[in-house]
A protein has these predicted regions:
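Protease-domain processing segments flanking chymotrypsin-fold serine proteases, especially trypsin-like
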Residues: 1-4, 54
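Sec-dependent signal peptide recognition
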Residues: 12-18, 211-215
Length: 229
């Protein structure tokens, strides 16, 4: 599998190092592949909605996504200030999934989570979404597995009760090939954070080997023949 880098217009002056690590699981030919991009601690401009974008360009030979998890590493800043999304052109229209939308912000707690930095995995199978489940007052780096925020409302008006309308399963069935764009912005004043790295952990749709498919068809044929007797 080939991993190439493409500079975004926002980061075209920053050299990025890309690392592709393939992990193969031997169950029925299924494979999970981790694509990781290290951004060398690029600043996320404080209180600036223009943010920064980082792009991974993948070439998998047309493989289709069966499931997707996203790793996100951010150093510093206030976690409740961050807004982030993942965008991909899936071949039949583009998909955008909101990963962060000012975690912890609610009507009761308008300033959101008082923690700095995170090293998390975002997965639809996690117990809680990051907005509602983030630790509120520990002041430490947040770690663990969370569902993506999914709230597409304006970051300046989002609350915990805003509807979640985007999920990582929205990418399922799409080709993995092409540009994957991570956008992140700091929507509040305070401290400058850095995007350290991010990753895509994909399981691809398994296509049966021709010999396996033939064996299944032969087995079905034998079964039908026995019924007719």
């Amino acid at each position: 599998m080939i991993l190439t880098m493409k500079s975004s217009p926002i980061l075209n002056r920053w050299p990025l190092a890309a690392l592709a690590l393939a992990l193969t699981a031997g169950m029925s030919g299924a494979a999970t592949t981790l694509y990781s991009l290290k951004t060398d601690g690029r600043d996320i401009p404080d209180n600036d909605s223009s943010g920064v974008a980082s792009v991974l360009t993948l070439s998998t030979g047309g493989k289709l996504i069966g499931s997707l998890e996203v790793g996100l590493d951010i150093a510093g800043g206030w976690n409740s200030d961050y807004y982030a999304y993942l965008h991909h052109n899936r071949g039949v229209g583009s998909v955008m999934v909101v990963l962060l939308n000012r975690p912890g912000v609610s009507v009761e707690v308008p300033n959101g989570a008082e923690s700095t930095g995170m090293g998390i995995i975002l997965a639809d199978t996690a117990p809680q979404d990051i907005h509602s489940g983030i630790p509120m007052n520990n002041g430490n780096v947040v770690a663990g597995r969370y569902q993506p925020d999914g709230r597409t409302v304006d970051p300046l008006s989002v609350t915990a009760t805003s509807p979640r309308t985007t999920f990582l399963t929205d990418f399922n069935g799409a080709t993995a090939d092409g540009d994957w764009t991570l956008f992140i912005a700091d929507q509040g004043g305070g401290e400058v954070g850095q995007l350290t790295s991010w990753s895509l952990n994909m399981t691809f749709v398994t296509v049966p080997e021709p010999s396996a498919a033939l064996s299944v068809l032969l087995a079905l044929g034998v079964g039908l023949g026995r019924r007719r007797r």
